[in-house]
Regions:
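Membrane-interface helix termini and inter-helical loops of multi-pass transporters
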Residues: 38, 164-180, 288-300
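Alpha-helical transmembrane segments of multipass membrane proteins
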Residues: 15, 26, 30-34, 99-100, ...
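Membrane-interfacial loop-to-helix junctions in multi-pass transporters
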Residues: 1-5, 86-92, 144-151, 176-193, ...
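Hydrophobic transmembrane alpha-helices that form the pore/transport pathway of multi-pass ion
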Residues: 1-17, 27, 36, 205-238, ...
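Core transmembrane alpha-helical segments of multi-pass membrane transporters/permeases
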Residues: 109, 113, 134-171, 185, ...
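Alpha-helical transmembrane segments of multi-pass membrane proteins
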Residues: 1-16, 42-45, 51, 185-199, ...
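Long, contiguous bundles of hydrophobic transmembrane helices that form the permeation core
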Residues: 44-146, 250-340, 368, 372
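Short helix-coil transition sites and intra-membrane helix breaks within transmembrane domains
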Residues: 17-23, 148, 162-168, 184, ...
Length: 373
């Protein structure tokens, strides 16, 4: 892979860690407070969007590897999972316990204390991982430092919320966006997205989310009738992707430093890799069933997720310009259109998108088969 692509993969993947359950970014804990639910519920509702995000990255990386003709590591050179799991699998016990306790409704403080105690216990059998007094003190110090940013963000959250309420700034912003959007939800979502991205350029995710959750999220909830969890998740997502969106793209700068690549090109490539993060929030804003909100049937959830997955594949293939062979511009336009069509709620739009993308895939398959004959 080229340096820009490698740096972009690092930036997009690490940024996605904030939206991936079970342990999401600090802003997710603030979201739980804002919405008034347990953190475990936020993590549960974020599963499908996060999986779609990383699936989109995987698809793009795979298509890029196919385009460049890269081959994987031979099977006999891969590390054996079984022996490795037997030797070190017990180290997963604290993480598994933490996830289980969060999902069972334990408070985060209680779950964290129990998981920390388990981490100390499982470190004992191995001399290399054993928590001696020095390591224990260093761990406490690191934990204290890491909690400072969250503690400050929680303190600032109340101040910002108070300022927005007392000065009428929130109502002013609501009136401005609703005035431009009218009753067009897509316009309100787009304006909110732009606000989140612009505000998030260089602003920490937690601070960005606090501001957006107290200003723009109420616009979507009160002005457009969007579900409260979906609205907060919407601003949460776009506050995060601001880290990989040029021209600032702080995560892309970090990735480019590691890969020794051009920061701006790395940011543009990272945006392509993370294209799912720019699309999926619109889907769950219109179809909150993806977040397990207002679910009428399991089939409906499956349909929404599968159509979103195929749509992400279409858009990723269009941006990458390769499926089974190099795609021409006409094929890329059809793939992009098919991908976007699949993300519009409705069976008819799903069928149209499926025909467009499926047609291009079949065309390339038969052309490649004919060329090989």
């Amino acid at each position: 892979y080229q340096g820009e692509f490698a740096g972009a993969v690092e930036a997009a993947s690490s940024t996605g860690g904030q939206i991936m359950p079970p342990i999401m970014g600090a802003a997710a804990f603030l979201m739980a407070e804002m919405v008034g639910v347990q953190y475990g519920e936020i993590a549960m509702r974020a599963i499908f969007p996060a999986l779609l995000y990383f699936t989109g990255i995987f698809i793009t990386v795979h298509l890029e590897a196919k385009r460049l003709g890269l081959k994987g590591i031979p099977k006999d050179e891969l590390p054996k999972f079984g022996p490795l799991f037997v030797r070190q699998g017990y180290l997963l016990i604290p993480l598994v316990a933490l996830v289980a306790m969060v999902m069972m409704g334990y408070t985060m403080s209680r779950a964290a204390i129990i998981a920390t105690a388990l981490a100390i216990l499982v470190s004992m059998p191995n001399k290399e991982t054993r928590m001696n007094p020095t390591r224990f003190i260093n761990a406490l110090e690191a934990g204290g430092k890491n909690t400072l940013s969250v503690a400050v963000a929680c303190g600032v959250a109340g101040i910002i919320a108070g300022v927005v309420t007392m000065t009428g700034l929130g109502q002013l912003l609501i009136s401005a966006i609703v005035g431009v959007a009218g009753d067009r939800v897509i316009v309100a979502l787009f304006l909110t997205m732009l606000t989140c991205i612009v505000l998030g350029m260089g602003v920490p995710t937690t601070a960005n989310y606090i501001i957006m959750a107290t200003t723009c999220a109420p616009i979507l909830v009160n002005g457009m009738g969007i579900n409260k969890i979906a609205a907060n998740m919407f601003v949460f997502y776009f506050g995060i992707v601001a880290d990989i969106t040029p021209p600032v793209a702080l995560a892309a700068y970090a990735g480019s430093a590691i890969a020794k690549s051009n920061p701006m090109k790395t940011g543009i490539t990272a945006t392509k890799l993370a294209i799912a993060a720019f699309i999926v929030p619109y889907i769950f804003a219109y179809s909150p069933a993806m977040l397990f909100v207002n679910v009428t049937s399991v089939f409906k959830v499956i349909q929404i997720v599968l159509s979103a997955l195929l749509g992400i594949f279409g858009v990723a293939a269009a941006l990458n310009g390769y499926i089974l062979r190099k795609s021409n511009w006409f094929e890329r336009i059809l793939l992009f259109a098919g991908g976007l069509t699949l993300m519009i709620p409705g069976t008819i739009s799903d069928l149209i998108g499926l025909v467009l993308i499926g047609g291009i895939v079949l065309l390339q398959y038969f052309q490649r088969k004919k060329a090989a004959a």
